[in-house]
Amino acid sequence: MPIDHVLKLYSESVRSPYLHYGFWDNPESVNASEFTLNEMVKAQGRYIEHLVSFIPEDVKTVLDVGAGIGGNSSYLLSKGYEVEALSPDEYQEKVFAEKYNGEVKFYRSKFEDFKPEKKYDLVLESESACYIQIEPGWETARKTIRDGGYLLASDYFLHHNDGSGDWHVKAAHDEKVYMETAEKYGLKLIREYDQTENTMPTLDGVKAFM
């Protein structure tokens, strides 16, 4: 896959180890017009902290799918997890090679095309689920996750199609179809959390910067 130049530009401009949204515990008190880039990076740190709080205690090995530039993998390593990473992006592969020098094994592949060499306790899809085709994605997940293992997805999903044709409607997976397909491949929902309000200041902040 060619380089995603939008994500590359973002990472080089913001100088954050993360490519995902920020997370605010009290979003109603946030004034986006007063954002600084440092505050945004801290909020991105809270995002992965909150996400990792959902990982069950019996998880030791994690495949970071759509691994970006390694921020999530670094956090997982700091918490004692054994981490490997996957992304089809050439630039992200280069970043991982420079950052980890082989400490974190990196697979340059679409998840749908991934041929796992082993099985993992957990597959993490942090804002990458929407890039993965639903049916082949769950088929690969079933082959990649050990029996009794987990998939932790954090992304935006479509609850209602307003017919607007906006990018977020086109990009998001239909949540009902996504979950029904998961069940088809033997996975069931354990826990969910709607963090829409917690992450919305990210978009408000982007507007303020523009």
Residue ranges and their predicted role:
Residues 1-30:
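N-terminal, positively charged/glycine-rich alpha-helical extensions of SAM-dependent methyltransferases
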Residues 41-58:
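Conserved alpha-helix/loop element of class I SAM-dependent methyltransferases that forms part
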Residues 63-113:
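Class I SAM-dependent methyltransferase SAM/SAH-binding core
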Residues 113-123:
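A short acidic, Gly/Pro-enriched loop at the edge of an enzyme's catalytic core
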Residues 122-135:
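A short SAM/SAH-binding and catalytic strip from SAM-dependent methyltransferases
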Residues 136-150:
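A short glycine-rich, Lys/Arg-flanked "PGG" loop and its adjoining helix->strand segment in the class I
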Residues 152-177:
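Conserved class I S-adenosyl-L-methionine
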Residues 171-192:
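Short alpha-helix
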